[in-house]
Amino acid sequence: MSEEAWARSAGGRAILAESPRPVPSRQRSNGVVRLRVARAGIAADGPTRIVDLAEGGPLRLRFPRQGAERMLEGVLVNTGGGVACGDVFEVSVMVEAGAACLLTTTAAEKIYRSDGANATILNRIEVGPAGRLDWLPQETILFDRARLVRRFEADLAPDASLLVAEIAVLGRAARGERLEQALFEDRWRIRRGGRLVYADSLRLDGAVSDLMARAATGGGARALATLLDLAPGAEARLDEARTLLDALPAGVEAGASAWNGHLAVRMLAPAIAPLREAAARFLAVWRDRPMPRVWQS
């Protein structure tokens, strides 16, 4: 039967086969949170209140406690459960003069296996005069073949305070996963009074687990942390920081240094559990207050 005869085989009516539907490209997520907070009233220890909050995509920001405390605590929630290749997540925070805010995450952030595209996380911070922000997310877990590009940018007033803690886990420990092929690119740029005071870049590309196994790079570490304090007077607390690090759990290697008006702590461990415990213990003493409740769950 010819194509024309076949097409007219149903009572003389043309029956045209539908063209195959195009296969949809992988769905990407664009998550956005924009937050602005300010101090309520004129008292120096007045509570911090939300001035403006915008949310988009799978990112949400929740405030479990809004009492009379000066520091407002917020919890970032990724309703998508993780970050996939091609996703772009952006968090922007403005802390106005005299206000104080703590931001954490509801759980560890998972960076899924990529089909080639990068996942991108952009964090932009601004802290006004005498303001304070504690940026304390829970750990980021990179799956094998994950590709993550992360940027952290902050602009601080001359007397503002910023405390940052970032923990990365290279592979899912429960599965004994190795990063045979992955990308982790982490870039920090922090300015005070318009002047660059801290710049740090990390790039792990390729066989990351093999790279971290080398003595000169990670010594077999599968979890790493950077804690950075840019509060006025932080540089003068170097001896205190080193004393705290001497009491960390076995298996955690750590060091502290201070220069240019800030203090930095690095930690390495073969697993996330001891490193997470070490970071939480250090931060609780350093901040002189308990860690957020989500860290204790």
UniProtKB/Swiss-Prot annotation:
<comment type="subunit">
    <text>UreD, UreF and UreG form a complex that acts as a GTP-hydrolysis-dependent molecular chaperone, activating the urease apoprotein by helping to assemble the nickel containing metallocenter of UreC. The UreE protein probably delivers the nickel.</text>
</comment>
<comment type="function">
    <text>Required for maturation of urease via the functional incorporation of the urease nickel metallocenter.</text>
</comment>
<keyword id="KW-0963">Cytoplasm</keyword>
<keyword id="KW-0996">Nickel insertion</keyword>
<dbReference type="InterPro" id="IPR002669">
    <property type="entry name" value="UreD"/>
</dbReference>
<protein>
    <recommendedName>
        <fullName>Urease accessory protein UreD 2</fullName>
    </recommendedName>
</protein>
<keyword id="KW-0143">Chaperone</keyword>
<dbReference type="Pfam" id="PF01774">
    <property type="entry name" value="UreD"/>
</dbReference>
<comment type="similarity">
    <text>Belongs to the UreD family.</text>
</comment>
<dbReference type="GO" id="GO:0016151">
    <property type="term" value="F:nickel cation binding"/>
</dbReference>
<dbReference type="GO" id="GO:0005737">
    <property type="term" value="C:cytoplasm"/>
</dbReference>
